[in-house]
Amino acid sequence: MTIVHFVGSLFFFFFFSYIFFYNDHGLYTWGCNFAMESPSPTSSPSLPTRFTPCPVAVLPSSSSPSWSFSTSCMPESTCSEISTSFFDTFNSSSDLFRSRICLLSDNRSFSIFSDSFTYFSFSISSCVSRSHSFVNLLSNFSMVSLTNSWIIAWLSSMYFSEISLDLSETLPNLSSPCSSVWTASFTHSINFEPDTLPSRLSPPLPFSVEPTTSRM
């Protein structure tokens, strides 16, 4: 039994070491996503060289506030959990907030445009597919409409009670089509346009926030 235990211990040691440190599709990949924070497009997190973080990008927006999330280290065809925390600064329970998610040409970044400046608390486990592009999220305190995206969302948070999927037109500004299956996972970073920062942010943001004028 001692030899069996010893061999078993060695097996699990090397197995988990491989998953965490050497396998691009392993658990280290997951941890990398949520450990990385890049408050500005020029910042680079401290990650091993084999993992390259994706840039944070803000696409052009006419008049609405915009913010961006970036992803990294996630292989395609892999579902992962999106855990993003927001606050509702307007304390509204009936307003309709419209946002659109755009899959960038690098197939590893989302840009989110919002018509209203508000924050939500939600947790999503999802994969992205070009065949589903419209998601309505109805929460118990507000509604957000995510359009022009390729997303199949499984909402695991109690804040949302309704999901509807339909087809929608694709966004311009995409230099290449999105992949058929794309991993949707966000890091905890957020960027705002300098002229859209609100004056009445009552609760502190749970992310590092830094104005940026970066454009795609």
Curated annotation (Swiss-Prot):
Where is this protein localized, as stated in its record? Membrane
Gene Ontology cellular component annotations, sorted alphabetically: membrane
The membrane-topology field of this record reads: Single-pass membrane protein
Segments crossing the lipid bilayer:
1-21
What keywords are annotated for this sequence in UniProt?
Answer: Membrane, Transmembrane, Transmembrane helix
Other information: Partially overlaps RSC8.
Name it: Putative uncharacterized protein YFR036W-A
Organism from which the protein derives: Saccharomyces cerevisiae (strain ATCC 204508 / S288c) (Baker's yeast)
